A protein has these predicted regions:
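C-terminal charged interaction modules
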Residues: 97-118
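Short, intrinsically disordered N-terminal pre-domain segments
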Residues: 1-16, 116-118
Length: 118
């Protein structure tokens, strides 16, 4: 399955992450729904996690590890989850293979990809 970056008015869309605020929670509207994301950092394992909540504060996913190039929330999907596919990646051509404190939110962003429904 090929994924296409969502392209509106030639702007590549992504969810902004500010590692200087971690741990923190923010809301974002994706397609027709608003979600809350809580971004945390596990200093021992050196990885980020994201908790996903619906507009009513119900937990959809807890402790999802942010892995470079792997779609978030891909293990369990149903109609409550975001329509776009969210993939942590770098589109600058740099050779990055993991999400780190130094690159997350800067070079590595949570890019939105069009979900192909077949």
């Amino acid at each position: 399955m090929a994924l296409q970056l969502i392209d509106l008015n030639s702007d590549v869309q992504y969810i902004t992450i500010d590692v200087s605020r971690v741990p923190y929670t923010f809301s974002v509207k994706l397609t027709d729904r608003t979600y809350s994301f809580t971004v945390k950092y596990n200093a021992t394992g050196k990885f980020f996690t994201i908790d996903l909540y619906d507009v009513n504060g119900n937990v959809l996913t807890f402790g999802e590890i942010v892995r470079y190039g792997r779609p978030l929330f891909n293990v369990v999907e149903d109609e409550r989850f975001p329509i776009p596919v969210i993939i942590p990646s770098c589109i600058t051509g740099d050779s990055i293979s993991e999400v780190t404190w130094e690159n997350f939110g800067k070079d590595v962003k949570l890019y939105l990809h069009e979900r192909k429904v077949e």
